[in-house]
Amino acid sequence: MLRIEHLTKVYDDGTRALSDLSFEVTPGEFLVIIGLSGSGKSTLLRCINRLIDPTSGRIYFQGQDVTAAAGPELRAIRRKIGMIFQQFNLVRRALVLTNVLSGRLGYLPPAWAVVNYFPGEVRRQAIADLERVGIAQKAYARADALSGGQQQRVAIARALMQDPQLILADEPVASLDPATSHSVLRYIEELNKKDGITVVCSLHFLSLVRRYGTRIIALRAGQIVFDGRAGEVDEERFRAIYGEDAVEVEIR
């Protein structure tokens, strides 16, 4: 489904965020990207859907060269890839329903978006997606009136509006408490297991990784230092990923 070939990203200030990354993601996987802050996790996810452009290398999604795509072709690829951000990326002053409806904009004529017109079936889908994440009762509340966990569930519903085949989740629980973290990850896990949506998710805590991921890729200084199953990350590998002085923190 997703193939990364020799991906490198060097920022304008000379920072090398990714160095010659190559791997594949098969349909239905729940792949978790781990590593220290600054290891390249967010850069990798943002390169995959071209929020930022890689310096070199190739990204293929369902056989299409994402790195070469532009205009309508790139928009068509992005429609199939839902994105969930650490800071939710909601329009905070807008209604919850309006935020969720925005996930469907890629399928609608541009003129409809200008006048904020969404057909009845699209609105019904938005309410159904909010029901799925247990927050339909907040549809007509402003996004900034919601808790962090509720806002992240709105973001999941927005991603669902795209009918995605791949979801990229960039540290979706980094700003949430443990109980809320599990709640949000269970919704993402349900999309993976019940809907067959492939997930690539960056996380910090190995206890969460072991609970939800089917595969781990660990980054260190922009390079892959581990690619395997969660249960294979023993103390030696943990220290190779996070450093000799690192201590594993368990999230229950």
Which positions does each model-derived feature cover?
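Helix-to-loop junction immediately C-terminal to a conserved catalytic motif
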Residues: 49
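Catalytic Walker B motif of ABC-type/P-loop ATPase nucleotide-binding domains
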Residues: 167-170
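Conserved ABC ATPase "signature" region
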Residues: 64-65, 108-137
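Helix N-cap at the start of a conserved alpha-helix in ABC-type nucleotide-binding domains
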Residues: 178-180
